[in-house]
Amino acid sequence: MFLKFCVVAFAICLSINLSEGAPSSETIYKFAIIADLDRKSISQKNDNNYKSIVKIGQLNQVGRKFNFAMENKDHEIFTKYAYKGRGAELSEFLVYKWKLYTFDDKSGIVFKLKNNADLVPWVILANGNGDQVDGFKAEWATTKGDKMYVGSTGISWSDSTGKLNSNSLWIKEINQDGKVLSSNWKEYYDKMKSAMNMPKGFIWHEAVNWSKKKNQWVLLPRKCSELPFDTETEETIGCNKIIIASENFQKINSIDIKGTPFDPAAGFSSFKFLPDSDDQILIALKTIEKNGKTATYLTVIDITGKVLMSDKIVNKDKFEGIVLLKSTEGFLKRKE
């Protein structure tokens, strides 16, 4: 009996030791990023063609550790639609009603990106209140309920004549039929500035998502400062904070992201919640435009501000949208 007990005890101890020593299983996430090439979007082969680039990557997770790899291939996508000689400056990636969309921040066009790499115009967003001749500077997009929400930077600025431009304070609600409702978010943007103790400063938004699981807004600002917006200095300013807000922005929390960013001038351009993380873990793009040069970084953080993967360089071009893909099979495969 004693011998049997020893054998069982040894087996249990061995099992425990093997479990503790065994490597955690790996989880793989496929994702794609899309570029805003600014003036480089004009095709060198055809002045009437404008291009963007989509790249595919893979994020690997083992426990709370992350790393990633990017495919070498550039998937070029083209459109002839432009505004004042600028086009395909695509600033976000979003799945809505099982289709993939992207947003031109010059023309205001919402494009559907098909698997064969065609960019198909779906909706044109007019600037500001929706009754203007120029396009909306779309910078972020998310889904909430049955609607797509599209927003801009959330800042006001004065032009060379001193006239105040507040078009970026508006957001667009779009239903599945393409009907657009324009809403002024000045009150919400001002509340966020107050919550961050920046009432006279500015917060530049490009990365906003609605969390269905937590019933709250999550925002990762691109830039933030206690000082008023200044075009002479904004290139040197980033932001290393998370904003969490209730549905109607009655309750707002500002969270510092722990650690030091690779470059203080880099700020968030897009993020998505990782599946099965209960909207607790975020994969995010950070971009920088400084002294005529650009770069894109990838990072992983949690909702408390803990950095799970520090900023890592992705590309020297500026990629402003990220989307998670269930599969990349057949993705952006042009028909021969």
Curated annotation (Swiss-Prot):
GO biological process assignments: proteoglycan biosynthetic process
Cofactor(s) the protein needs: Ca(2+)
Cellular localization per UniProt: Secreted
Disulfide bonds: none
Name of the protein this chain belongs to: Apyrase
UniProt organism field: Phlebotomus duboscqi
Pfam families: Apyrase
Keywords, comma-separated and alphabetical: ATP-binding, Calcium, Glycoprotein, Hemostasis impairing toxin, Hydrolase, Metal-binding, Nucleotide-binding, Platelet aggregation inhibiting toxin, Secreted, Signal, Toxin
Reaction catalysis annotation: a ribonucleoside 5'-triphosphate + 2 H2O = a ribonucleoside 5'-phosphate + 2 phosphate + 2 H(+)
